[in-house]
Amino acid sequence: MAGGFSVSGSGVEFEAKITPIVIISCIMAATGGLMFGYDVGISGGVTSMDDFLREFFPTVLKKKHEDKESNYCKYDNQGLQLFTSSLYLAGLTATFFASYTTRRLGRRLTMLIAGVFFIVGVIFNGAAQNLAMLIVGRILLGCGVGFANQAVPLFLSEIAPTRIRGGLNILFQLNVTIGILFANLVNYGTAKIHPWGWRLSLSLAGIPAALLTLGALFVVDTPNSLIERGRLEEGKAVLRKIRGTDNVEPEFNEIVEASRVAQEVKHPFRNLLQRRNRPQLVIAVLLQIFQQFTGINAIMFYAPVLFNTLGFKTDASLYSAVITGAVNVLSTLVSVYSVDRVGRRMLLLEAGVQMFLSQVAIAVVLGIKVTDRSDNLGHGWAIMVVVMVCTFVSSFAWSWGPLGWLIPSETFPLETRSAGQSVTVCVNLLFTFVIAQAFLSMLCHLKYAIFAFFSAWVVVMSLFVLFFLPETKNIPIEEMTERVWKQHWFWKRFMDDADKHHVVPNGGKSNGATV
């Protein structure tokens, strides 16, 4: 396998080969993203199926087939939106418990708990006889999302060698996109199965749920997690195993030092608010808010519903959603290749321009061609809308999609990493919930201007990246403070060298263990 060295801030070289166990562990752990993506993708297709609406939302079905209802308002129903968004509200709540389990029980066991929640939730959804069972199933799936999204990005960032950390971490987002595509393909097939096709759509979530559960049973926990829980020898043995070398002392000592400082922190959530941790916290929180206000989840949740609204028939709308799902997967592969080469900032800035232009174009086309009563786009215009949606999705998929998870998971010091990831997931799910719950109502009231609304947010977030987001590629995870935050023109003012938690002297010199 390929070998190499990761250079630490103190000049110490961390020897690390790209070993099969690292690749396999990362692939298995990243199936948590597969489950998340399937849950995101499946709800939009299911809620556009007449059989599903007849069973649970007959009033929406009636509105859908009545000409008197505005095209933009056919699906404006709080109960229907709650079906989609309840998952994210449950995930938000579960995140607080997941922070405790990742710290006390480890990353691996937390992923196993997520898998169990997913399996039980799938059973409830597939067998749902009424709306209550349906919502309970979504809530259980949401708990799984909370635990998985807490543990998986941390696991990937900690187990990966520094020089390919970005690419391996993006496996999580790649699996999210594959899950969405899988869901779109399933919906395209099950829409033709009457009257129980929707049950099959919801039940097939059991496949990614089983993969995550089995994966969590067989992967090793991260050295950082084992050492943090006092299992030093086991942590060193795992470090040797995953790095493919016996020469792990420098990296081991750095993790031990970071862990020692982490043990002194009794209240990690309170510690997040301390001045020296504010840059990481602000970046993590804003990245999650900005990620949702690109409008991506609004489009991915409701792609079939959205295309239906624009005048596509059910088959055509699901087919168009499959196309956008495929573009999502392929574009995320671009990020896997380029994130450790061109860096995080460049991908985000390029995507900002592309997302802005495509959303403005969609708003203009819809403003001209789709009115409250007329949705006859015409073949050429319809193709243009799909192309513009794909252009938008592709730019998101190689930027804000994966990097919204990668950057927070690699910037927090060990002492606040679990708490920081918890806040990251919590904010992400909170704003995902807000968008999921509000989108169909916003579409009803703003109409085509909803895309102009999201494009304005893209301008704001791109300016933030330009001025305030530091580059983190090829920086060892335990050395972000010294080599990133203390060097940044704005954030360095929050870094206090006198703070004993920053750099612990070792024979009069920094050993590079920053926290």
Curated annotation (Swiss-Prot):
It is a multi-pass membrane protein. One of its GO terms (cellular component) is membrane. Its main location: membrane. The keyword Transmembrane applies. Belongs to the major facilitator superfamily. Sugar transporter (TC 2.A.1.1) family. Mediates active uptake of hexoses by sugar:proton symport. Can transport glucose, fructose, mannose and galactose. Can transport xylose and ribose. This is Sugar transport protein MST4. It comes from Oryza sativa subsp. japonica (Rice). The gene is MST4.
